[in-house]
């Protein structure tokens, strides 16, 4: 099973490495887009002299920046220099903008000089380090430049032409909207940046050079589908999902942080249909009205989208209509799904816990065991929020925790950055989304790692602050399993159990899911024993030998102290455990 996990992580790394070469340079793409929108012949302020800058930026500056960044990712400054030299060979060896070539030659240059250094660095005699380092970078870069000029450039040029022709054929066949069947689910799998900046941005820039705009910039950045789903929750949702959806709408639509609506979709997986329907209808409208943008819209905010639309009223209206249609369609589909739902309450926290368990099961793993880790101001000197791109939702999560840390009177810096830029430094607390934690641990094994389901709404932040201030230990940090063994339900006498209580500490989400799981098992086996949840502080009411209390390993000591006379079932996970079936098999009520 671990092979599947590593394969999934490798796929994520590939997509992330592509987007990480583009995203740090998005400012240059936007500058080029503004220059194009203003000064070309059909721009807002036509200027022949300034328009001459458009071509060199597209042909040389942008690809070299990508190649430089790709080399830097592999081997720092030396890798960046060699990657940039190699990229120039690909650029001059082709007649098309060499973005894909830069994505190949940049990392290749960094990898080559890295291997050279690993082999020869220790063999350099004292006093010759600068001479060898400078000449080795120059000669390796020179060799790769020749390779790129004669081999990589022409090959990539042919491939780029083929891909461009394929995209053009898809557009002409009116099949581009079908891409949203893949794009919308991919967002939740953390591939949105890889798709948008690793694939659509390079192809879109080439389309802008030829046609002045590109619809590809709108495929992933369209905020309409997410807006419609959040609006449906605001009207037809229940509980915390309904009350929190209004604020989420503002952050999503105007802030461009699309990750904020992912938990709402995962709460009701059928809402993937709403997201896909909205994406398909929005892209169809864009295609029908010949809409497009002049540069990437990053983040996917309606403000960024309007700012990068072509000159004129109609181009802006066409873009807005596509967003509106996507929002309306996703709202209607989501409204039908939510209206037909018969559950009494939508709990974001419970849905996030269930999502974490489902993801772990899909990877062939059990949910991470909860442990008590020693986190204090002595063991943590800085906190880093890490995600694919190092911006967006991680930046907002860092802002939320930074405010809590400041209010607690702690002087611990809280920042955000891309996982690919993490360093293996001790006394660092790294916060990542559960799906990305394996990669973060691989980059920084010496750090303390905390997994959250949602950067923008997590009770874990209060736990982190409480642990840092010494108020309480932080639970569910990735670490070793405690040596204390769980209490087997088969050791308990279950013939006289009158009630089952699922205990929880600060967060009720997983306890609620566990409670519902036990109830479902009891219904199937016709066991008429009430099942409920209770805070640890309320367990005194259930301190009886005919009460079964279910809890996790990390809370075992507190629960047994609160209700010493009760019977206990200690499990790894309140959401997914075989112990519930074993317990039910030994009950006769």
Curated annotation (Swiss-Prot):
It catalyses: D-mannitol(out) + N(pros)-phospho-L-histidyl-[protein] = D-mannitol 1-phosphate(in) + L-histidyl-[protein]. It is found in: Cell membrane. Its main location: membrane. Residues 1-25, 73-135, 188-274, 339-589 are cytoplasmic. It comes from the Bacteria. Residues 381-476 form the PTS EIIB type-2 domain. The modification Phosphocysteine is found at residue 387. This is PTS system mannitol-specific EIICB component. It comes from Streptococcus pneumoniae serotype 4 (strain ATCC BAA-334 / TIGR4).
């Amino acid at each position: 099973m671990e092979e599947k996990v590593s394969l999934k992580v490798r796929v994520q790394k590939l997509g992330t490495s592509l987007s990480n070469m583009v995203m740090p340079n998005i400012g240059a793409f936007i500058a080029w887009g503004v220059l194009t929108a203003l000064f070309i012949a059909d721009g807002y302020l036509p200027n022949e002299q300034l328009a001459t800058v458009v071509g060199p930026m597209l042909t040389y500056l942008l690809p070299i920046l990508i190649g430089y960044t790709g080399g830097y990712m592999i081997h720092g400054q030396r890798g960046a220099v060699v990657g940039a030299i190699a990229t120039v060979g690909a650029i001059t060896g082709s007649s098309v903008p060499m973005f894909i070539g830069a994505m190949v030659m940049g990392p290749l240059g960094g990898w080559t000089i890295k291997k050279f250094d690993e082999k020869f660095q220790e063999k350099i005699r004292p006093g010759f380090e600068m001479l060898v380092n400078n000449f080795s970078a120059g000669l390796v870069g020179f060799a790769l430049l020749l390779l790129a000029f004669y081999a990589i450039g022409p090959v990539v040029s042919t491939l780029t032409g083929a891909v461009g022709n394929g995209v053009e054929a898809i557009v002409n066949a009116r099949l581009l909207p079908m891409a949203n069947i893949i794009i919308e689910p991919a967002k939740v799998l953390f591939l949105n940046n890889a798709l948008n900046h690793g694939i659509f941005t390079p192809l879109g820039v080439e389309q802008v050079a030829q046609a002045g705009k590109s619809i590809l910039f709108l495929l992933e950045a369209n905020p309409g589908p997410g807006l419609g789903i959040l609006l449906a929750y605001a009207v037809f949702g229940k509980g915390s999902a309904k009350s929190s959806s209004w604020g989420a709408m503002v952050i999503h639509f105007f802030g461009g942080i699309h990750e904020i609506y992912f938990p709402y979709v995962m709460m009701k997986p059928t809402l993937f249909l709403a997201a896909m329907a909205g994406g398909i209808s929005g892209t169809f409208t864009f295609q029908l009205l010949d809409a497009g943008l002049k540069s990437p819209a990053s983040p996917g905010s309606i403000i960024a989208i309007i700012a990068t639309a072509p000159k004129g009223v109609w181009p802006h209206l066409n873009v807005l209509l596509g967003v509106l249609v996507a929002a309306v369609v996703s709202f209607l589909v989501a409204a039908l799904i939510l209206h037909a739902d018969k559950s009494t309450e939508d709990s974001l926290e419970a849905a996030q816990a269930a999502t974490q368990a489902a993801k772990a099961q899909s990877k062939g793993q059990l949910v991470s065991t909860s442990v008590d880790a020693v986190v204090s101001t002595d063991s943590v000197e800085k906190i880093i929020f890490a995600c694919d791109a190092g911006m967006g939702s991680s930046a907002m999560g860092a802002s939320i925790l930074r405010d809590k840390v400041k209010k607690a009177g702690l002087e611990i810096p809280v920042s955000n950055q891309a996982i690919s830029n993490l360093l293996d430094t001790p006394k660092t607390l790294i916060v990542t989304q559960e799906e990305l934690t394996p990669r973060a641990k691989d980059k920084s094994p010496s750090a303390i790692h905390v997994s959250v389901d949602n950067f923008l709404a997590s009770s874990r932040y209060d736990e982190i602050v409480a642990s840092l201030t010494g108020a309480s230990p932080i639970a569910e940090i990735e670490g070793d399993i405690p040596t204390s063994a769980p209490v087997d339900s088969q050791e308990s006498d279950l013939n006289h159990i009158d009630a089952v209580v699922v205990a929880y500490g600060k967060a009720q989400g997983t306890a609620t899911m566990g409670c519902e799981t036990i109830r479902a098992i009891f219904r199937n086996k016709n066991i008429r024993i009430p099942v409920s949840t209770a805070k640890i502080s309320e367990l005194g009411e259930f301190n009886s030998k005919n009460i079964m209390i279910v809890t996790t390993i990390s809370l075992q000591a507190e629960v047994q102290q609160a209700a010493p006379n009760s019977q206990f079932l200690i499990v790894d996970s309140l959401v997914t455990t075989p112990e519930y079936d074993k317990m039910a098999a030994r009950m006769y009520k």
